[in-house]
């Protein structure tokens, strides 16, 4: 029985990886295109504006698959390292982490309604007319 459960779990992991698309960083219509290094600086609070546009990033909830993928693919960090970075930064008065939203729909709504809004979603959630800032 345990062997069957392990096999089913392994198949589920493979299927999940196959279904997961690329991560896209989306921005409000006034947000310019960014490279990965600029996205890293935005999500670590080192850039608060890009090309004269004040940036207001949001993040997925801690522990979600999309956040873990974003941290790995874009930030080259895991959750523990990223959270630790922001704990220190907040302690020394150098900023606060991006607000966390609970669903892709919330991220999309925030980005579309907030000048300078930036967030990340799975490519499968992308809709026509969205401003894709970068993808990976």
What are these regions (language model features)?
Residues 20-136:
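Flexible loop/hinge segments at secondary-structure junctions
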Residues 11-13, 63:
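N-terminal short leaders/motifs
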Residues 10-11, 35:
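Generic hydrophobic-segment detector
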